[in-house]
């Protein structure tokens, strides 16, 4: 189960916020606009990666979420579970990577690494 751990308002009037999600194994910082979420509630939706690049297949099973301290950039490692909809799974998180061009040799079931400039909640 993914929980909304923290909401940090960027602009409350514009409903723009940084949202920290956790499944107790991984934490992902997302941008949300409009943000209508509440702290400590369950989050069941998919999240979206933007400016998806540096996509490549891993030689072994690996899961990781690495955030750049100075930006919203993330390096993600996980299982590519849906090649039709470009979905990456890390723990309980399902991340839509359709903003990027997935190489044709990557298929569902492969483990991949990818960089995104931002992760969003709609």
Report residues per predicted region.
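Short amphipathic alpha-helical surface micro-motifs
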Residues: 1-3, 10-12, 25-28, 57-61, ...
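Short aromatic-glycine-enriched beta-strand elements
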Residues: 15-19, 84-89
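Flexible glycine-rich surface loops and low-complexity tracts that mediate binding to linear polymers
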Residues: 40-53, 78, 108-122
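Beta-strand/loop nucleic-acid-binding surfaces
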Residues: 23-37, 90-108, 115-116, 120
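OB-fold/S1-family single-stranded nucleic acid-binding modules
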Residues: 49-73, 117-122
């Amino acid at each position: 189960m993914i929980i909304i751990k923290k909401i940090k308002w960027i602009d409350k009037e514009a409903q723009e916020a940084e949202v920290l999600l956790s499944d107790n194994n991984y934490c992902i910082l997302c941008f949300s606009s409009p943000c209508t979420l509440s702290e400590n509630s369950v989050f069941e939706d998919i999240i979206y990666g933007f400016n998806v690049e540096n996509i490549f297949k891993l030689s072994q099973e690996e899961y990781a979420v690495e955030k750049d301290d100075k930006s919203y950039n993330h390096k993600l490692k996980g299982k590519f579970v849906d090649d039709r909809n470009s979905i990456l799974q890390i723990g309980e998180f399902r991340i839509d990577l359709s903003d990027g061009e997935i190489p044709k040799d990557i298929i569902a079931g492969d483990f991949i690494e990818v960089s995104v400039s931002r992760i969003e909640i709609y």
